[in-house]
A protein has these predicted regions:
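A general structural signal for short secondary-structure boundary/capping elements
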Residues: 65-67, 130-137, 180-182, 188-194
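C-terminal catalytic region of ATP-dependent kinase domains
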Residues: 142-239
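Conserved ATP-binding subdomain of kinase catalytic cores across diverse folds
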Residues: 1-100, 120-124, 150
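Conserved kinase catalytic-core segment
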Residues: 93-156
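Short, surface-exposed, polar/charged, turn-prone segments marking secondary-structure boundaries
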Residues: 57-61, 69, 115-119, 143, ...
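Short, low-complexity, polar/charged sequence segments that are solvent-exposed and flexible
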Residues: 48-53, 79, 105-111, 161-166
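Short, structured coil/loop segments at alpha-helix boundaries
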Residues: 67-79, 97-99, 104-108, 136, ...
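A short, terminal or domain-edge coil/loop segment
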Residues: 10-14, 110-124, 179-189
Length: 239
């Protein structure tokens, strides 16, 4: 596990306002610590591992650690990151958030895959206004970021259909049983990664505080129910 050496700043964008950190490998990461809630960290870890297993162009990520010595030296406003293990997403250079005008340049298969994955993990947080997709114009490539809102217990299928940045591509799947079968087979290849990620969660993430006397607000059984939709015939259900 990589140690965080320096906490440089805090991002202004994003609901969780991740910290910008330098790790011992000399690379810069956007880091979500205790401030982001355990559920957010867990969703990032599980969602990221599943996306990676599917071959989606997810930004590289790591488990990073804020050591005791570093933590004690932090100013008060930076201590919100907390001590211990955090989720870190490697900072990406030379890219910007995907703009609506660039959507036609994105391969349709990639659009379908990203939308189908978000539907699978119940992630509504990829919209025109907040795509959570980085775009490199020089080579017309995408980078997928942010799975902290995956496994949403308040997921609204109709909102997803209306607001997802690749909603048009997703509707193609719903209207074509061959595409649905292809997507189901593809999505099932993420199940081993799901189980492995769940089985290898940091033990401290079971607690909402550093004292480890307040259980984290995270329900593994609800996450399992979300994933089981692919086996019980309800994956594409709108109701």
């Amino acid at each position: 596990m990589l140690q965080i050496q320096t906490i440089m700043d805090r991002a202004e964008q994003g609901v969780t306002s991740p910290f910008i950190c330098m790790a011992e490998n000399g690379l810069e990461y956007f880091v979500k610590g205790l401030h982001a809630t355990r559920a957010s960290q867990i969703n990032e870890w599980i969602g990221g591992n599943m996306a990676q297993a599917l071959g989606l162009p997810v930004a590289p990520f790591e488990l990073l650690e804020v050591g005791e010595e570093l933590y004690e030296e932090l100013p008060a406003k930076m201590k919100e990151i907390g001590k211990g293990i955090c989720f870190g997403s490697l900072a990406q250079k030379g890219c910007a958030l995907l703009e609506p005008a660039d959507i036609p340049r994105i391969d349709t298969v990639m659009q379908r895959q990203i939308a189908a994955f978000d539907w699978f993990v119940r992630n509504e947080d990829r919209t025109i206004g907040n795509p959570n997709l980085l775009y490199r114009n020089c080579n017309n490539s995408l980078i997928v970021i942010d799975h902290n809102c995956a496994f949403d217990t308040g997921f609204n299928p109709n909102n997803f259909l209306q607001n997802h940045i690749f909603s048009s591509a997703f509707r193609q799947i719903l209207e074509d049983w061959v595409l649905r079968e292809e997507m189901e087979l593809w999505l099932k290849s993420a199940l081993p990664a799901y189980r492995k990620a769940c089985d290898n969660l940091p033990s401290e993430w079971a607690w909402a505080n550093e004292e480890r006397d307040l259980p984290a607000a995270y329900n593994r059984s609800r996450t399992d129910e979300t994933v089981r939709r692919i086996d019980n015939g309800t994956l594409w259900s709108i109701s």
